[in-house]
A protein has these predicted regions:
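Short, well-structured N-terminal submotif of metal-dependent ribonuclease cores
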Residues: 1-44, 59-66
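A general alpha-helix detector
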Residues: 12-13, 51-55, 90
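Acidic, PIN/NYN-like endoribonuclease modules and their adjacent C-terminal/linker elements
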Residues: 1-5, 108-136
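Histidine- and aromatic-rich ligand-binding microenvironments
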Residues: 8-9, 44-45, 100-101, 122-123, ...
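Alpha-helix capping/helix-boundary segments
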Residues: 12, 48, 87, 106-107, ...
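Active-site neighborhoods of divalent-metal-dependent phosphate/nucleic-acid chemistry enzymes
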Residues: 79-117, 121
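Residues that scaffold the ATP/ADP-binding catalytic core of kinase and kinase-like folds
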Residues: 15-17, 55, 128-129
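Active-site-proximal, substrate-binding regions of enzyme catalytic domains
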Residues: 53-79
Length: 136
């Protein structure tokens, strides 16, 4: 992961992606706009991506596809760093209809980084390596 100088939170990312409210969007855009090529960038943790994904849908009426597209575009900014898992997951084709979905894949990525199996009841997770799907 490239060197980072700050971690961005959900409220910051939401303002950039929704432009709402406008004064906060302008301030967030100004802050991001101060970044210079070659300078340390900004980390966006998986939890922030997951919260933003749900907030865009439930508070701003984005479709799953539009929320994921907005996150993908945002994470492609040269100053933005995300986990390898988030980067690869956001690049998956048809992610908005994929099973397991975006957040489940982020959770699986965290279990891989921890070098532990993921234990779940989510049947679709059987497609992911090192995953135990419990049956009732």
């Amino acid at each position: 992961m490239p060197e980072v100088s700050h971690t961005l939170d959900t409220s910051f990312v939401i303002r950039l992606l929704t432009r709402d409210p406008l004064p906060l969007f302008r301030r967030a855009a100004e802050f991001l706009g101060q970044w210079k090529t070659g300078a340390p960038g900004f980390l966006v943790p998986d939890l922030v991506l997951a919260e933003t994904y749900f907030a865009l849908q439930h508070h701003y009426s984005f479709s799953k596809e539009d929320a994921l597209s907005a996150l993908l575009s945002f994470t492609r900014h040269p100053a933005i760093s995300v986990s390898t898992c988030a980067d690869k997951t956001l690049a998956l084709p048809q992610l908005s209809t994929a099973k397991p979905g975006f957040v489940d894949r982020l959770i699986h990525g965290a279990s891989e980084r921890a070098e532990t199996p993921l234990v779940t009841f989510e049947k679709s997770a059987r497609l992911l390596p090192n995953t135990i799907v419990l049956k009732v």
